[in-house]
Amino acid sequence: DLTIKDGEISLLDQTQSSTPTLYNHIDVKLSDFAPNTPFTVDASVHMAGAGEQAITLQGKGGPINSQDASLTPFHGTLQLKNVGVSDFTKFLNSPATAGTDGVLTGETKIDSDGVKVTANGQTNIEKAKVRGMELGFPVSMQYDLTDDVPNGAITVRNLTTKLGSTPINLNGTMQTKSTPAHIDVNLRANNVSVAEAAKYAAAAGIALTPGTTVSGTVNANIHAVGSADKPALSGTLSAANLQASGKDLPQPVQIQSINLNLTPTQIQSNPFTITSGTTTANAQLTMRNYTAPSATVDATLRAPNAQLPAILAMAKAYGVTSLDKVSGQGTLNVDMRASGAVKSLTAAEIEKTLNGTVNVNFNNVKYSGANMSSELSKIAGFLRPGSSQSTSGMTNISKMTGNIAVRDGIAETKDLQATLDIGNVGLVGTANLATEALNMRATAVIAQNVSQQVGGQQIGGFMKTALANNQGELVIPAIISGTFSNPHFQPDVQQLAQMRLKGLVPNLSNPSSLTGVLGGLLGGTKTPGQTTTQQPGQQQKPADAVQQVLGGLFGKKKQTNPPPK
C-alpha cells in the first residue's frame, strides 16, 4: 500500500510541455499497487480557498498502460464538493478559465476499458461568473458520453444543459481527429429564456448595447451535420415575444414572432415584423449555399412612414453604435433589398449587396459629433462668427428632406436639403455603406442677416472660398470626405469656379437650382440659368445623420470617402 497525506505531486506530460506541473494539498491511498496488476485508489484534493472544498476520486484501475497512462483501465467515481472554480484554476495552474468563477458540485461515474472512456453524471454551478460577469442564475449539466480515445470519436448519448430552469438537449457524435471536427448532432430547446441566454452570451463576450435588456422565448429542433465551423442544418428555429428595452433606447423594440426553416442548402425566415412605437418594419431573410465559401443572401426590409425615434431605437437595440450621437423627430420611408453573393456573413459584405431607396423628412435633429456651422465659418473665414455659431460639437438641424438611392451598397443623394440656424445647406454625392467612405459636395447659403453679422463681403474667404449673391447672402461651397462619425470639410474651389464662370450663385429661396449646380459638377444634369439655392445652412452632419439612419437599418455604417475630383 501507498499513503500520502497533504502531499505534492509533480506530473510531466511530455506530449504537451517540457515543464512539470506541481499539485499540492493531496491525500492519496493506493492499495494492491504493483506492476501489471489492478489497484484501488482513494484520492482527494483540498482546495486552499474559503469553505470546505474537496475533489475526491475513488475506484479501481490498472494495470497501468506503460505506453500511454491515459489508456489505463479505470472504474470509479469523481466527486466535486463546493469547489470554487477560481480556486480550482489556481490548483491546476491554468489560465484557461481566467475570469470564470462559481461553485462546483457534482458526481461523475467513470468507466474506461483502456480504449473507450465513458462519463455519466451531473455537475451544478452556483453563483456562476463568466469573464467576471455574474450570470444571476444557476447552470447545470447532465451528461452521458463515451470518448473512443484512439479513434478520436466522441458519442454523446445525452447532454442536457440548463441555464436557470431552461433545458437545452444535445446528442450525437463528433469526430475530433479532423480540424475542424466533424459533427453529427441533434439539438432541442423548448421555451428557452432569451433573457437568460443573453446574460450568458454577454458574459461570453457576445452582447447587445450596454444597458439593453431583452426578453422572449426560443424553440429549436436542429440537426447539424458536417464541419463544426460550417455544418449543414436541418430543422426549425423560432422565437416569440422578443423585446429589447433599456435606458438608452427611446422606446422598446419588439418582434412578435419569427420562424426560420433550415435545410442543408437554405435558411429562410417567414415574413416578420419589427415594431417600435407606431412604426412597423416588414422584413424577410433567405440565405442559400451557406456552407459554401461564398453564400448568397436575399433579404428585404420595408418601413413606410417610419418614425425616426423608432428607427434609432431599432438600431441601438441591435448594437449599432454609429447612431449614438443622433436624435430627432420626423419620418422616413425605407424600401431596401440585400441580394447577392457574400464572402462572409458580416455586415460589411451584406452591405455591398444593398439596393433600394430611402426618403427622409426630419425635424429637430441633433448630431453631437460635429458643428457644421463652425466648419463652414473656417472655410469662409468669417470675421465675426456671431452667437449662432457655437464652438460646441453639436449640429442643430431644424429641417431635413431628400431622397437617397442605394445601388450595390453605394448610397447616393441628389437633393438632400437641411435647414440650420445660419441658413440652408444642399448636398449631393455618395456614401459607401461598406467602406464608410463619404464623397459629398455641399453648398451652404447663409441667411442675409447672418451674412452681415459675420462680415459680409469682408470675410477672409470672399471670392476665394465663398461668394455673395445679389441678395447679400453668402454662399459657401464645400467638399465633405472622411467618415460618418468623423467627416472632413474643405473648400470646393471647383464648384466656386463653376458658379463664377456660369453666374449661378444659389439663394435661400431656390434650392432646386442649387442641386442643379451640384449635379452638374458630379456628372449629373443641371438646368441652365438656374440659381442654386440651399435650405437653411446645415452641417455635413445632417448628411451624416441620414447615412447613419441607413446604418441603423442595415447594420453599422460609417464611411470614409475620397474627396471628389
Where are these regions (language model features)?
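Amphipathic hydrophobic-ligand
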Residues: 16-28, 48-62, 90-109, 133-144, ...
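Secondary-structure transition motifs
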Residues: 1-32, 52, 90-93, 170, ...
